[in-house]
């Protein structure tokens, strides 16, 4: 339903406020990416999920890793701040796979990357699997910071779901971006990607809590 033309109109309206616009609309033709960029989109997030072609095909039987990488390279050439990322703890994943994930980020020239532990959802075919390791996740984030010192590395939502009060530890490992959900409460149930409590959304209060969290980490909110 959200065609490039409709998305472009939304981007133009949002840009009138002076805010930067980040899109995450999946794989699209080059022409669509170019049009949205012309409309003012600044960034695009398209996670590659895994650099292992066999694991990727098992998770995305109707797509291919090669196509996903091609889209990321197009986004980079069009001048988007390009974000990707991958899950940690997927079935069949190895240390070598994770190393390939990091090298792929370097090859593409990503500006941002989200790295979070895999969390099985009870309504999916992977529901019987175990979650990814939070410790491995933090180590991979640390390696990413060493390999790509200018990369923006968010503390992912999935890591917060699994690690609870320890979620801020990842900032000592190299993460430098905080993301806060502001989805209106009535819409949250339509985007339950993790089996966690949805909670209420209170934007003003949440902003204050976020600023307190950042200050407690001896960072400056901006």
Predicted regions, residues:
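A general structural detector for well-ordered alpha-helical segments in enzyme core domains, enriched
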Residues: 6-10, 32, 67-72, 97-105, ...
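Core AdoMet radical
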Residues: 1-71, 81-88, 111-114
């Amino acid at each position: 339903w959200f065609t490039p033309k409709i998305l472009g109109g939304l981007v133009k309206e949002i840009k009138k406020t002076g805010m930067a616009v980040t899109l995450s609309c999946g794989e699209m033709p080059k022409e669509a990416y170019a049009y949205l960029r012309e409309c003012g989109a600044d960034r695009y997030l398209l996670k590659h999920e895994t650099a292992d072609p066999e694991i990727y095909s098992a998770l995305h039987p109707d797509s291919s890793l090669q196509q996903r990488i091609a889209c990321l390279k197009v986004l980079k050439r069009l001048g988007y701040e390009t974000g990707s990322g991958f899950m940690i703890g997927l079935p069949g994943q190895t240390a070598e796979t994770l190393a390939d994930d990091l090298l792929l980020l370097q090859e593409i020239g990503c500006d941002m990357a989200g790295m979070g532990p895999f969390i099985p959802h009870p309504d999916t075919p992977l529901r019987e699997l175990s979650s990814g390791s939070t410790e491995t996740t933090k180590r991979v984030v640390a390696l990413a910071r060493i390999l790509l010192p200018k990369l923006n590395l968010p503390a992912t939502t999935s890591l917060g779901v699994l690690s609870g009060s320890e979620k801020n530890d990842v900032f000592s490992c190299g993460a430098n971006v905080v993301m806060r959900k502001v989805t209106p409460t009535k819409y949250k149930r339509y985007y339950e990607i993790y089996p966690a409590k949805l909670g209420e959304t209170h934007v003003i209060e949440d902003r204050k809590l976020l600023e307190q969290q950042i200050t407690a980490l001896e960072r400056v909110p901006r």
